[in-house]
Amino acid sequence: MPARAPPRRLPRLLLLRLLSLHLLLLTLRARCLSAEPGQGAQTWARFARPPVPEASGLLHDTFPDGFLWAVGSAAYQTEGGWRQHGKGASIWDTFTHHPRAIPEDSPIVMAPSGAPLPPLPSTGDVASDSYNNVYRDTEGLRELGVTHYRFSISWARVLPNGTAGTPNREGLRYYRRLLERLRELGVQPVVTLYHWDLPQRLQDTYGGWANRALADHFRDYAELCFRHFGGQVKYWITIDNPYVVAWHGYATGRLAPGVRGSSRLGYLVAHNLLLAHAKVWRLYNTSFRPTQGGRVSIALGSHWITPRRMTDYHIRECQKSLDFVLGWFAKPIFIDGDYPKSMKNNLSSLLPDFTESEKRFIRGTADFFALSFGPTLSFQLLDPSMKFRQLESPSLRQLLSWIDLEYNHPQIFIVENGWFVSGTTRRDDAKYMYYLKKFIMESLKAIRLDGVDVIGYTAWSLMDGFEWHRGYSIRRGLFYVDFLSQDKELLPKSSALFYQKLIENNGFPPLPENQPLEGTFPCDFAWGVVDNYIQVDPTLSQFTDPNVYLWDVHHSKRLIKVDGVVAKKRKPYCVDFSAIRPQITLLREMRVTHFRFSLDWALILPLGNQTQVNRTVLHFYRCMVSELVHANITPVVALWQPATPHQGLPHALAKHGAWENPHTALAFADYANLCFEELGHWVKFWITINEPNSRNMTYRAGHHLLKAHALAWHLYDDKFRAAQKGKISIALQVDWIEPACPFSQKDKEVAERVLEFDVGWLAEPIFGSGDYPHVMREWLNQKNNFLLPYFTEDEKKLIRGSFDFLALSHYTTILVDWEKEDPIKYNDYLEVQEMTDITWLNSPNQVAVVPWGLRKALNWLRFKYGDLPMFVTANGIDDDPHAEQDSLRMYYIKNYVNEALKAYVLDGINLCGYFAYSLSDRSVPKSGFYRYAANQFEPKPSIKHYRKIIDNNGFLGSGTLGRFCPEEYTVCTGCGFFQTRKSLLAFISFLVFAFVTSLALIYYYSKKGRRRYK
């Protein structure tokens, strides 16, 4: 056996290089797994791509165990008692007593009788009167079920002069009583030492925070608080929102103390605030942490900013914007003790310098990152120059991700967050509630999807109070306070009930009704697609000129007509139309069983009557429906649909009042008769009127439209049904109307009222009583509006029951509120505020994607009109025309069809069909399953998803057995003669066979005989 060769040794230099490369890869991998400080600029690129629909909507998940659920308040905003028990004056007492501080947008409060009430106060002298209502406030906390309560101590209440002299015992007793009550409830306090209310004596003596000496006085005040309250407090905030204190207190003068100094003074004040904070943190860390075991930080406010364009320059400007607001204070504390480079480069002559010892003193002086995010800074007090020409955005999730990357993954406690409503809004604060939902949802996504370490959330605020420069013109509380009342009772708003339920669930846990359902529809379920107006193109694909031509090959090189020679004309065929076959091919690719489209009344009858009938167009429609039948696709044809121009009516009818004219109803019946005669042999599903726009239609027009529908229905029922055996109805748009505040009875009443006006107006006469809804009539009478016509008894009988099925179009869900919040979206006529849940997914056209709304609409229709056969004759969404994947449509179709399945399987709705909207972008841009450009149709990816649902007849899970449905074959409409005469045909066939056989035998033997005699 030969000896084994010794192993080859790698050169020493190569080993060193490989080792270096390995270490480099490990380093790069580590940086990818956890970005180093200062990497916040990556955030914009990370969120630049639009997320998949599943990640854009509501995330059904819960917060980590031990998550801190808090609510907050500030002393000056809520305490009142400005002269009680020895309290000293603060800069806000002085500032608000000056007329300049009265907000210009203070609301005029009206009594129930309509008379104006006395004007609201313009100061915080009484505010919510928390100083005299400790038990009331803490009962509010108990109702909410929070784990933590953030409040601030009034410096001037415990030290009236601001300096460490004899403290105010009554002030100390008030806070001790509050802390004791919190302990009884099991609620942990989060205490802010300074929330903008500096003792006026310190402002007068030292010039406020512009004097560096104030840092020492702040340290003394903090030491007093730590000594008296520290045993019960585990979370301390030194200063709230130093940006606002420095910039708007001492530079712009918009807030107390109202110093309109230079920007240099603003930067100097911020410098002193940072030193003051660091002194207090060092004091606690050295003298109190060992025995009290608490944590100390500073509450930093911030906005979020997005680039106008995704370029390096605009991203740098966004980074600079955050540096100038949040980084101004966060970088010295959380990184290196110094200001951001962008500030130092741009403000070299204005920005004070830290000494090296001060940098070391400030650096690391926070035990967690306390974040304030809300309207006060983000959208009201952000200086325009600090946006750097970029765009503000209320995206808390992206800000949390930026902080996580920029400041080395700190623990983040959101210590202030919320929104606001108008000062006239009472307890149904839907806008605030949905912003609260949005921010909490974004916090959850930051935790679960982005890995950000968010440890707590604080809703702002516990109760309505004095809102700084806005006075009482807005409200931010979870509890309503009547500032003109004596007792100042706290009344829970819808937002409080929502927050209480959310805390109880620890987030948004998956619910059974949110889970997709596995199952199938019945075998005869109609799977369709919609194209509101098919392209009527009567161009023939074959050469139809009857003349004969010769090719002049020697001279002109042209065709020369031969005079007197004409070819025989052939009968036209449907296959000659070049526009029909491509559309049939598209439908076959989708594998739909039904196709809905609308006829063009004005095209068929240009004059509105049968004195002039466009036979070419009528022949095209006849060919279209017959070819659909031959392709085993059932046509569903609408006689009329509102469209431009002239509402889709013949011009002659439009110029004479359109549907305002009762003659239009008679003309419609005449037009329907023509269509039934010409197309009824192939069409078995008719829609008289498709999606009449009830919101843009007068009551008189709706009255005539209902009679037109009924006339057409009875015409078909009496004259054509027996022979054609079709079905006919009207298709109404039924978008779901949901109460904005689910806890509000008034919102429920408003939602029902809007549904009756939107849907019941036309549905109740047909599917219900034969007359208009009582709700509608009563409301109009209250409004002294007597324009809604009355039906005669004969008309009621004519209209009632004029249907064979209930057809509805459904696209979205709308929230309604009775409180007037946004004048632009407020309907004074119905006294309803329309809005949307900002956590909902939206299309590019801002259509909300709310799948459960379809199920609710179907159940409401059954509740109102009984167990009728229903068809969803249109359901779809627009998409981004530039996106390769129409992922929104895939998500939309899948989830809406699944809700339809729930309605059928779980609720027992007699649902017979579903039609997706729409076939192509040709007639409705951005809404089709096919892109259309340069006369070419390109399928979008969503077609495969819809086709899969059709093939499965629903949703088949791993353990779901599909329902066996026998294959259906095309019915030959001309085969009846043969089916009924089988015996005769067999006999004739036998005779023909015998005759042919005899001829063959005669021919054979005659040939054989001739050969024999040759």
Swiss-Prot record:
GO MF annotation terms: beta-glucuronidase activity; fibroblast growth factor binding; fibroblast growth factor receptor binding
Extracellular side: 35-983
EC number(s) on file: 3.2.1.31
Transmembrane domains' residue ranges: 984-1004
Cellular-component GO terms for this entry: apical plasma membrane; extracellular region
Induction comment from the UniProt entry of this chain: Down-regulated by angiotensin II and iron overload (at protein level). Down-regulated by acute inflammatory stress, and in models for long-term hypertension, diabetes mellitus and chronic renal failure.
Ranges where the record places region Glycosyl hydrolase-1 1: 59-508
List of glycosylated residues: N161, N285, N346, N609, N614, N696
Keyword Oxidoreductase belongs to the record: no
Domain comment, as recorded: Contains 2 glycosyl hydrolase 1 regions. However, the first region lacks the essential Glu active site residue at position 241, and the second one lacks the essential Glu active site residue at position 874.
Subunit and interaction comment: Homodimer. Interacts with FGF23 and FGFR1.
Protein name: Klotho
